[in-house]
Amino acid sequence: MKKIAVDAMGGDYAPQAIVEGVNQALSDFSDIEVQLYGDEAKIKPYLTATERVSIIHTDEKIDSDDEPTRAIRNKKNASMVLAAKAVKDGEADAVLSAGNTGALLAAGFFIVGRIKNIDRPGLMSTLPTVDGKGFDMLDLGANAENTAQHLHQYAVLGSFYAKNVRGIAQPRVGLLNNGTESSKGDPLRKETYELLAADESLNFIGNVEGRDLMNGVADVVVADGFTGNAVLKSIEGTAMGIMGLLKTAITGGGLRAKLGALLLKDSLSGLKKQLNYSDVGGAVLFGVKAPVVKTHGSSDAKAVYSTIRQIRTMLETDVVAQTAREFSGE
C-alpha cells in the first residue's frame, strides 16, 4: 500500500479542492492510502471516502506570506510540517501540498532530507509542448544560485525521472542558454556545457533556447533556479494571455466570431487542455529522500487528483530509491 501524506490546508481552495481530489484518487486507485493533515472540522464536510483515509487533526497551518524557514521551525504542528515528519518517520511514503512553496522546499530539505551526494535538490515540473508530450525542467526555483556541478546533477536527475516515470528510453537533455552554439553563454553555462557533453550516460543534445521549449526540442531542460523560475512564470503567463486574448476576441467579435468559436470548439478545448497544468501533476523536489510534490496554489480537485496519480507512479517505479542508489554508487 502506497501511503501519501497530504497537507489538506495548503492552497487557495483548501481544504475543499484538496479533499475532493483525494476522494477521486481513492476511488480510482485501490493501492493508495491517504493521510489528511489539517483541521478535522473543516475537512470532514468534503470527505466522502470511507476507506484507506485518515485525518490527523491540527489547528496550525503555514500561510502563504509566512517566511519559509522560520515557519518550518516555529510552526511545528502545522499541517505541512506534520505531513513532512510523517515521511521522515516512515509513516508515509510521500508528501503533497498546494501551500507555501518556500516552506515546502524547506520541509523537504530540513525534515525529509537530501539524498547522499546530491548537493542541491532541484524543483522539477513537466511543462506543456505543442505535441502534448511535455518536457521536464529543473531547477524551477529551489535555488537562486547554482554551480555547474549542480546543473550537471540536475541533468542526471531529470534524465532519470524522464526514463523511470515518463517512460522515455533515451531522454534528450538540453541546457537552457541564449543561443544553440556551444560557445554561447556566461561562464556558468559554458562550464556546464562541458560537463554535460563529457557525461556519456546522458543523451545531451546541446544548448536550447527558450523560444523552442514548447516545440519539444528536448525531453529534459536544465537551468539554474533563478532562470528556470523566470521561464516557468513566462510560460504560465503566456498561456493565460493566449487564452485571455482568444476569449476577448470571441466575446467581442460579434456573431461571426461566436459562430467560428462554435465550429472550433473541439480544437479550442484541446488547446486549453494542452496548456492546463491540471492534467500534468505537480512540481517535484527531486533529490530528497522521498517524493515531495508541490501542486499549484490555485489547484482544483482535478489538479490534486493528477498530482496524486503522479506520486503513485513515482512510488510504483521506486524512482527515488533508484536515484539514491545511482548517486551513492551502490
Curated annotation (Swiss-Prot):
It is an enzyme of class 2 (transferase). Its EC number is 2.3.1.274. It is found in: Cytoplasm. Pfam families: FA_synthesis. It comes from the Bacteria. It catalyses: a fatty acyl-[ACP] + phosphate = an acyl phosphate + holo-[ACP]. Catalyzes the reversible formation of acyl-phosphate (acyl-PO(4)) from acyl-[acyl-carrier-protein] (acyl-ACP). This enzyme utilizes acyl-ACP as fatty acyl donor, but not acyl-CoA. Homodimer. Probably interacts with PlsY. PANTHER family: FATTY ACID/PHOSPHOLIPID SYNTHESIS PROTEIN PLSX, PHOSPHATE ACYLTRANSFERASE. This is Phosphate acyltransferase. The gene is plsX.
